[in-house]
A protein has these predicted regions:
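Intrinsically disordered, low-complexity, positively biased terminal segments
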Residues: 1-246
Length: 246
């Protein structure tokens, strides 16, 4: 139930399969700390100890495999529990989808101590997820009709090349009343965006911003004003993140 609530509140997360739950119960190498409030589990952290040196057995690191929390107070409590393990491990490896996670730390610099020109300190290693792929754009929009968008009325056409079918396609989406839907094929588009199929998936999932894609030349639009409005409609406050193996 705790993980289900976490998945429902965080963009991109999915429910655990029964196989994952059974595997977790049998994995004796992973330790878990739970946060309970009124008898209800409101968060937990799953971690394992790993050797951090080939020549010094006293050097260890703590690798966090799961960090589930219902709010910031629970998160801070779980991080405090990890801090109590500092006599057993000198460093901690955390995986998170929160871009601003380093603001929780008094010193945001990671253990690399890398300095990046000019005046930048390395805080983390970033990675691109490969879980979310767009195979059928129209079906994706239909199945996610429940999503809430900012207020606005606009019809957008996305032109891209379907790499699997080896043909050009056009996905028309109508935004109205805080929802989106597949627009009729002959509807007039307020703005037409041309991009790659993979970038379209990122745009529709909220993994990237349309304005950045236009600045970089990764996408083009035929109406600058409407493109800015479309960027506002597509923007979501949290980028998708998934901590499940697949």
């Amino acid at each position: 139930a705790c993980h289900s609530r976490f998945a429902a509140k965080n963009h991109g997360m999915v429910e655990k399969f029964e196989e994952e739950v059974r595997a977790a119960r049998g994995d004796i190498q992973v330790r878990r700390i739970g946060y309970y409030d009124g008898g209800q589990l409101r968060g937990y952290v799953a971690y394992r100890f790993e050797s951090a040196s080939d020549s010094n057995y006293t050097q260890n690191r703590l690798s966090v495999e799961e960090l589930v929390y219902e709010d910031g107070a629970v998160l801070r409590a779980l991080l405090g529990a990890l801090r109590l393990q500092e006599d057993l491990a000198q460093t901690v490896i955390l995986r998170t989808g929160e871009e601003d996670f380093h603001h929780l730390l008094d010193d945001p610099q990671d253990i690399s101590k890398n300095y990046i020109d000019y005046g930048f300190l390395q805080t983390n290693v970033s990675a691109i997820g490969t879980m979310f792929k767009l195979v059928d754009g129209e079906m994706f929009v239909e199945k996610t009709a429940y999503r809430t968008f900012p207020a606005g009325t606009l019809t957008a056409a996305f032109r891209y090349r379907d790499e699997m079918a080896d043909c050009e396609k056009c996905l028309r989406i109508a935004f109205d009343g805080g929802r989106w839907a597949v627009a009729v094929a002959d509807s007039t588009a307020d703005v037409t965006v041309i991009c790659r199929q993979g970038d379209l998936a990122s745009l529709l999932m909220g993994s990237c911003g349309l304005e950045a894609m236009l600045r970089l030349g990764a996408a083009t639009a035929d109406n600058d004003e409407k493109a800015r409005e479309l960027a506002r409609l597509l923007h979501y406050g949290q980028k998708p993140w998934l901590n499940s193996d697949y």
